[in-house]
Design a protein with these regions (language model features):
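The feature captures the beta-strand-to-loop junction immediately N-terminal to the Walker
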Residues: 49-51
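Helix-to-loop junction immediately C-terminal to a conserved catalytic motif
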Residues: 64
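Conserved ABC transporter NBD signature motif
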Residues: 72-80, 88
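Conserved ABC ATPase "signature" region
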Residues: 112, 116-139
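Catalytic Walker B motif of ABC-type/P-loop ATPase nucleotide-binding domains
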Residues: 168-171
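H-loop/switch region of ABC-family ATPase nucleotide-binding domains
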Residues: 203-204
Length: 248
């Protein structure tokens, strides 16, 4: 088990889909991020673990253009996140705590609405493809309010990937899901990973997080305390190691 932050946080920046350098975010006297740096190559899946208040959601908000950092930089697919360029918006998909779905619309109506926002060609075909990928084709004409929490989360991923983004951000996607819904969501994310999407996910679910990723980060008090390849992680003893890292 690696016991400290890997010093080579950006070994191959010239080939990286995501390049983050010394991101800092202050809220008055509170430092939510204090110098986060890392690279992520195309098709890699990074899971970020950390307690509440570690700065995980703040990091996701900055990387998706929803919040400006106090200092530092972030590049995604060659686009500067700080400029919030429309082209960058087309490269990313975001699943946050809110599903961003309209409960009184059907699944198909929801995706057709977003397809029009993205000015997609063949919007109905794209919407039906996304619904099928979520395993919800038999419920596509049902109002989203009738869906279970797990089904709504799968629909949220269908919404976030409708425009075929190259990078996907997920903030605590397994929260509130039962075992069946968790497994269905894992299958959906597995397919996206196979499809070479670059994925960053925050989660408290250690089992799911380790099972799906290529790289692991532990974040606390605004810093990455660990950033390592899953191949170098002692999976059987990770929970104990995780607790030790947070207590240092």
């Amino acid at each position: 088990m690696v016991s400290r932050m890997n010093e080579q946080t950006h070994p191959s920046s010239s080939h990286s889909t995501i390049q983050v350098r010394d991101l800092r975010k202050d809220f008055g006297y509170l430092q939510a991020l204090s110098g986060v740096s890392f690279d992520l190559n195309k098709g890699e899946f990074l899971t970020i673990f950390g307690p509440n208040g570690a700065g995980k959601t703040t990091l996701i908000k900055i990387l998706t253009g929803l919040m400006h950092p106090t200092s530092g930089s972030a590049i995604i697919d060659g686009f500067d996140v700080l400029e919030c360029d429309a082209e960058l918006r087309n490269q990313i998909g975001v699943i946050s705590h809110a599903t961003c779905l309209y409960p009184d619309l059907t699944a198909l109506e929801n995706l057709l609405f977003y397809a029009k926002l993205y000015c997609l060609d063949d919007p109905e075909e794209r919407a039906n493809e996304s619904i099928k990928a979520a395993g919800l084709q038999l419920r596509r004409h049902d109002q989203v309010r009738t869906y279970s929490r797990g089904m709504q989360q799968r629909m949220a991923i269908a919404r976030a990937t409708l425009h075929n983004p190259s990078v996907l951000f997920l903030d605590e996607p397994f929260t509130g899901l039962d075992l069946s819904a968790t497994n269905a969501l894992k299958d959906q994310l597995h397919d996206l990973h196979i499809d070479k999407r670059t994925i960053i996910m925050t989660t408290h679910d250690i089992s799911c997080g380790l099972e799906m990723c290529d790289r692991v980060a532990i974040q606390n008090k605004g810093k990455f305390l660990l950033l390592e390849s899953i191949d170098r992680i002692d999976l059987e003893n990770f929970e104990h190691f995780y607790t030790e890292v947070l207590e240092k």
